[in-house]
Amino acid sequence: MRPLQAEIIKALHVAPTIDPEVEIRRSIDFLKAYLTKNTFLKTYVLGISGGQDSTLAGKLTEMAITEMRQETGDDRYQFIAVRLPYGNQADEADAMAAIDFMQADVTDRVDIQPATDAMVTALEANQLTIHDFNKGNIKARQRMIVQYGIAGEMHGAVVGTDHAAEAVTGFYTKYGDGGADIVPLWRLNKRQGKQMLAALDAPKHLYDKVPTADLEEDRPALPDEVALGVRYDDIDDYLEGRTVSDAAAEKIEAWYLKTAHKRHAAITVFDDFWK
């Protein structure tokens, strides 16, 4: 095993194999424990895209909230799923299929296009040119603004979808989808998430589809693997301690080192990881 590979696996707490049922229960208990400890919280809020990660996080959240209601008799516990399209999005049918599967207590829909476009217009009024990639990150941050707006009114915490395969590559928007209160998928790679969804009898097309962040307008539905330059199978193998090609390992490690700032709080004078 490569030296940095061992360090990454340890840092991200990835197991070489999982028992899906055990990990499902682990995530549910984790979500419940956070609510039990923080009695002022009564809801979990999660943005739903129709992809694998939000489908899994959403189902686990729904199961945790259902158990909290049953065990406490407190009907204020709710899971709020939020659709956050930018105008009309191609994944709408998948998003609704995911919501049907997870059976959220409340489903909200907020179109982020007006707020995103207004922000871009305001920035460009200052002689800035907002490129498409940057605008994509603005979309991701607008989505998190909405989720925190809902959570703030509903005594809630925002659930994140980050997992080990995203964490190792930094493939998320800082203070966008990377900004959340609790992340029940942390420790899992992409392959393990699929195993859990299969165990939960999720619609197969929701986790067999090609993963895409779909934030860029110039490159709509750009596959994650194209953007990253490495396959998820290679990322998963690497995180499970397996041997991958030197090219794949070097690409993964380059992403890990380049995106270290995303896995840390704001840098202080006491931090030296970036030096």
From Swiss-Prot:
Pathway: Cofactor biosynthesis; NAD(+) biosynthesis; NAD(+) from deamido-NAD(+) (ammonia route): step 1/1
Keywords, alphabetical: ATP-binding, Ligase, Magnesium, Metal-binding, NAD, Nucleotide-binding
CDD domains in the record: NAD_synthase (cd00553)
Matching InterPro entries: NAD/GMP_synthase, NAD_synthase, NH(3)-dep_NAD(+)_synth, Rossmann-like_a/b/a_fold
Keyword ATP-binding: yes
Binding positions (deamido-NAD(+)): R141, K174, D181, H261, K262
Keyword Magnesium: yes
Gene3D superfamilies tied to this protein: HUPs
GO cellular component: cytoplasm
Binding site for ATP: G47, I48, S49, G50, G51, Q52, D53, S54, T161, K190, T212
Matches recorded under PANTHER family: NH 3 /GLUTAMINE-DEPENDENT NAD + SYNTHETASE, NH(3)-DEPENDENT NAD(+) SYNTHETASE
Function comment: Catalyzes the ATP-dependent amidation of deamido-NAD to form NAD. Uses ammonia as a nitrogen source.
Family: Belongs to the NAD synthetase family.
The name this protein goes by in its record: NH(3)-dependent NAD(+) synthetase
